[in-house]
Amino acid sequence: SKVVCLNSATAAEELNLRVCGIQEGDEVIVPAYTYTASASAAIHCGAKVIFVDSQKDSTEMDYDKVAEVITEKTKAVVAVDLGGIICDYDKLYAAVESKKHLFRAKEGDSLGARIQQSIGRVIVFADCAHALGASRNGKMAGEIADFSDFSFHAVKNFTTAEGGAST
């Protein structure tokens, strides 16, 4: 029920990252198999992108490798729901929870710090640009991750020629 519309999914992802206080010195995990915008939004925030390979015979990122690359600098992981196939968020959340002890939320009272303190672990973002209307295990794209973004570009499932949304 809470949606912000923007000019693109890239802008929506960058907004989500900035609202959560992602900045220079932070690490953001992104799948190696994705569109450039999944990583460039983090770069625009000044964060270092850590790429994770896909699973064998799948476009989904390898969740064991996600857990392996989480450090004290990791603040976010961006899952990409590609071609209407929603990532296995149960496995992704398990990977993130297994490294919860490494998470260091920002200090202070800024919105980003409060969000990080409230969540208390690496924040899970979903790039749902190719998944509007898709579901997995009874949950729709956009309602599984902590923050999600959608695209309404001309080649997407639902188009307005351009545009994006953040949930």
Regions found by a protein language model. Name each.
Residues R18, A165-S166:
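Short glycine/serine- and small hydrophobic-enriched flexible loop segments
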Residues A37-S38:
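Alpha4-beta5-alpha5 switch/output surface of CheY-like receiver
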Residues D26, A32-T34, D53, C128, ...:
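Nucleotide-sugar donor-binding loop of glycosyltransferases
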Residues G46:
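Structured binding elements
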Residues V4, I29, I50, I123-F125, ...:
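Structural detector of well-ordered beta-strand residues that form the stable sheet scaffold
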Residues S1-E27, A41-I43, F51, K100, ...:
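Phosphate-binding glycine-rich loop
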Residues D57-T160, S166-T167:
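Active-site phosphate-binding strand-loop segment of PLP-dependent enzymes
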